[in-house]
């Protein structure tokens, strides 16, 4: 049977309210024109971005994923899905499964337990940078009431795009000296951007011409067609490899109502900052002049911008679809106005009725983020350990007690008290390792992310940290070094938001709390693709004696391969 098909029929499951949604996907490279310049993209069933999955809370999703790449392994991570009872389906190569070899098919099977805006992406090498991503939208279960009221919705997947291929980028990052990937050439909205022209050329000081498109152009923007005096839900997800973004709609207020798949206390803003790995829902009311169209913009924040903002158009159906707005697009806030960014983050509170965090913690980790050298190679390290994922997936090693699958020694839970976070490290050296933090089942863990200066003076970056397998409560943010016994007094324990991704700001700290109630092994890492490639991550293992059955197909590499062969052929 040919594999260029997709099964989109929902099969009734054992309960009346849940369905099984089954898909067959092939992933391969193809030529595309994401930003009006031809390049290689990773496509799912020929689509870039990949197909959108729509499901209801409680549904089971089954994806038969075939690797049609000639020379690369493959996995897909279901970003924001907690994988309760299915840690092997999380899609993190070397952590929860082996990479799928070329020509092979692996089946993901998991339940989506609650509604929310999510996405999926490659999690092997830097395949997300190559375009392996798509949207994953979970609506409320049948018979349940959506608390938000709106007349229609749009789904916008934001990403950044380079003209240099990802393999060259990976080689450069792993070279001595390192060759940095540089800023992206374009920002894409739903896989479409414009590198050599502008939708707002008449308002720009650059020499770029006004974009003109013909039917079928892959880089032509997807306009959002709206009716006057209606309210629309815009679902935003950032799958960027590097860029932090600011999103705005000209002349319209945004009411932020959801963050990382969790309802929040609504608040109104002119624009929002969105970091790699984050998702939001905003409500927009079309209450402006219905004879006009309006720019939608996504511009770079947090890094000195060398990438033009992405643009598309909010088209009132009472105005000509091809008509461009008559005034300039919203200006992206200054890239290094971090106070503005922090103020936005501090406006996000959990919706009434959301779960509250435990009042105290059982264990605490303070994770220092540093840039270091290992034998002359530039790396990122956590408490002076740069992560190198082992050849045997952690999940297989702990499930079958394979003691040599990774280093079983405990990693540092803190860093030296005299470390100066404001200057380059006195000792630039770090070590490489594959240790994991092991926790008992159902304990409360606090994680303090501590930022610091990089290898160069006056250089501290934003790092968006993403935790697999969990939501966590964001308890607070602070400046400088975290002070145990003092800074806890600033925590928000009343209504902290539940997130799966959180920003760590330059020279500051971010505090989060989670409960180890999901047996498995879970990646926790910076969601900036090159930073993770250079070692910026840790691994949490919890409730190990409660991990259920793991399909053999997930673990057919490394030490688990031989173990399973011996077990199945005594």
Curated annotation (Swiss-Prot):
One matching Pfam family: Cu-oxidase_3
Cofactor binding mode and count: Binds 4 Cu cations per monomer.
Keywords tagged on the record: Copper, Disulfide bond, Glycoprotein, Metal-binding, Oxidoreductase, Plant defense, Repeat, Secreted, Signal
Protein localization: Secreted
Ligand binding (Cu cation 2): 79, 121, 527
Catalytic activities: 4 L-ascorbate + O2 = 4 monodehydro-L-ascorbate radical + 2 H2O
GO BP annotations, alphabetical order: defense response; L-ascorbic acid catabolic process; negative regulation of defense response to virus; response to hydrogen peroxide; response to jasmonic acid; response to virus
Glycosylation positions in this chain: 109, 196, 229, 343, 384, 407, 434, 442, 458
Predominant location category: secreted
UniProt pathway: Cofactor degradation; L-ascorbate degradation
Signals that turn on the gene: Repressed progressively during incompatible Turnip mosaic virus (TuMV) infection (strain UK1) in resistant cultivars (e.g. cv. Aki-masari) but not in susceptible cultivars (e.g. cv. Yukihime-kabu). When the plant is infected by a compatible TuMV strain (UK1 m2), the down-regulation is transient and last two days. Induced by jasmonic acid (JA) and hydrogen peroxide H(2)O(2) treatments.
Disulfide bonds: 36-219, 98-557, 197-211
Keyword Metal-binding: yes
Signal peptide annotation: 1-18
Matching InterPro entries: Cu-oxidase-like_N, Cu-oxidase_2nd, Cu-oxidase_C, Cu-oxidase_fam, Cu_oxidase_CS, Cu_oxidase_Cu_BS, Cupredoxin, CuRO_3_AAO
EC number: 1.10.3.3
Domain spans labelled Plastocyanin-like: 33-140, 154-317, 426-543
Cofactor dependency: Cu cation
Binding site for Cu cation 4: 463, 526, 531, 536
Residues bound to Cu cation 1: 77, 466
GO molecular function, one term: copper ion binding
Assembly description: Dimer.
UniProt similarity note: Belongs to the multicopper oxidase family.
Task of the protein: Ascorbate oxidase involved in a redox system involving ascorbic acid (AsA). The oxidation of AsA represses responses to high salinity and oxidative stress conditions such as vegetative growth and seed production reductions. Negative regulator of defense responses toward incompatible Turnip mosaic virus (TuMV strain UK1) by preventing jasmonic acid (JA)- dependent accumulation of ascorbic acid (AsA, AS) and dehydroascobic acid (DHA).
PANTHER family: FI03373P-RELATED, MULTI-COPPER OXIDASE
Protein name: L-ascorbate oxidase
Upper taxonomic lineage: Eukaryota, Viridiplantae, Streptophyta, Embryophyta, Tracheophyta
Gene name of the record: AO
């Amino acid at each position: 049977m040919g594999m260029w098909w997709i099964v989109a029929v929902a099969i009734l499951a054992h309960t009346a309210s849940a369905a099984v949604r089954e898909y067959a996907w092939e992933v391969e490279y193809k030529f595309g024109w994401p930003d009006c310049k031809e390049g290689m993209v990773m496509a799912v069933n020929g689509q870039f971005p990949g197909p959108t999955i729509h499901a209801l809370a409680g549904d089971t999703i089954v994806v038969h994923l075939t690797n049609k790449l000639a020379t690369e392994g493959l996995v897909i991570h279901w970003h924001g899905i907690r994988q309760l009872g299915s840690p092997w389906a999380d899609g993190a190569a070397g952590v929860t499964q082996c990479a799928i070899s070329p020509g092979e098919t692996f089946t993901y099977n998991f339940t989506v337990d609650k509604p929310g805006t999510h996405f999926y992406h490659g999690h092997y090498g830097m395949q997300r940078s190559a375009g392996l991503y798509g949207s994953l939208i979970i609506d409320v279960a049948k018979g349940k009431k959506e608390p938000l009221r709106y007349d229609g919705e749009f789904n916008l997947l934001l990403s950044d795009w380079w003209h240099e291929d990802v393999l060259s980028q990976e080689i450069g990052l792993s070279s001595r000296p390192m060759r940095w990937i540089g800023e992206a050439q374009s920002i894409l909205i739903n896989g479409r951007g414009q590198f050599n022209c502008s939708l707002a050329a008449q308002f720009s000081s650059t020499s770029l011409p006004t974009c003109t498109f013909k039917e079928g152009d892959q880089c032509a923007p997807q306009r959002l067609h709206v009716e006057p005096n209606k309210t629309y839900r815009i679902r935003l997800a950032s799958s960027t490899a590097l860029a932090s973004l600011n999103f705005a709609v000209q002349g319209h207020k945004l009411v932020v109502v959801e963050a990382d798949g969790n309802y929040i206390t609504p608040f109104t803003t002119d624009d929002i900052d969105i970091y790699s790995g984050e998702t939001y829902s905003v409500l927009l009311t079309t209450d402006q002049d219905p004879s006009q169209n309006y720019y939608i913009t996504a511009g770079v924040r947090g890094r000195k911008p060398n990438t033009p903002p992405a643009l598309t158009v909010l088209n009132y159906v009472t105005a000509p679809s091809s008509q461009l707005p008559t005034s300039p697009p919203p200006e992206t806030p200054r890239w290094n106005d971090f106070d503005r960014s922090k103020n936005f983050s501090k406006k996000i509170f959990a919706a009434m009725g959301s779960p509250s965090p435990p009042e105290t913690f059982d264990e605490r980790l303070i994770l220092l983020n540093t840039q270091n050298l290992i034998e002359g190679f530039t790396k990122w390290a956590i408490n002076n350990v740069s992560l190198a994922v082992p050849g045997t997936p952690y999940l297989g090693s702990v499930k079958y007690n394979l003691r040599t699958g990774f280093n079983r020694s405990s990693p540092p839970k803190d860093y030296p008290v005299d470390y100066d976070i404001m200057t380059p490290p006195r000792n630039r050296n770090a070590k490489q390792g594959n240790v994991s933090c092991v926790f008992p089942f159902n304990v409360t863990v606090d994680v303090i992310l501590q930022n610091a200066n990089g290898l160069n003076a006056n250089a501290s970056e934003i790092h968006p940290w993403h935790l697999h397998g969990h939501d966590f409560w964001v308890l607070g943010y602070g400046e400088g070094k975290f002070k145990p016994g003092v800074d806890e007094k600033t925590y928000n324990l009343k209504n902290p938001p539940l997130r799966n991704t959180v920003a760590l700001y330059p020279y500051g700290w971010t505090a989060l709390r989670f409960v180890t109630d999901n047996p498995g092994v879970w990646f926790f890492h910076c969601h900036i693709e090159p930073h993770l490639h250079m070692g910026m991550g840790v691994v949490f293992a919890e409730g190990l004696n409660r991990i259920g059955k793991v399909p053999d197909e997930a673990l057919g590499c490394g030490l688990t391969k031989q173990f399973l062969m011996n077990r199945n052929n005594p």
